[in-house]
Amino acid sequence: MSLTLKQTLTPYQRNATAVRGTKVGEVKVKGNFVYITNRNDKKFNGNDSLTQYTISPNGSLTWTANTSSYGTYPRTFDINKAGDFVAIGDQTTSNVAIVPRDPKTGKLGERVADLRIGAAGIPENEDGLSAVVWAE
């Protein structure tokens, strides 16, 4: 078996360079969309971000949007079974943000709920919130 590089992308529009220290936390595919969490990019007034890509018929990815994670160090996220809500688990701020998702366009909306889970963590300490899942 061999692998062939097909595309190189950054998580930002026009393939802009990521801020030094930014890390990808999690990657998920839902339908024709790929989502990734961007840890430590502070793209939204100190909050980190999620990136959405659209998968073309030939398999290439096109940047679609960056949206706020509504906290810092988005370690994990989960899309509900219906595909219309996303739970974002921000590790360092120990919060779960719920945002709507359009199942047709894949676009994420503005936060509709937020819950703090335990004490906030310390950046780079790997403490705080570590996982979110929908119990459906």
PLM regions: where:
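Feature marking well-ordered beta-strand scaffolds used for ligand recognition
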Residues: M1-E136
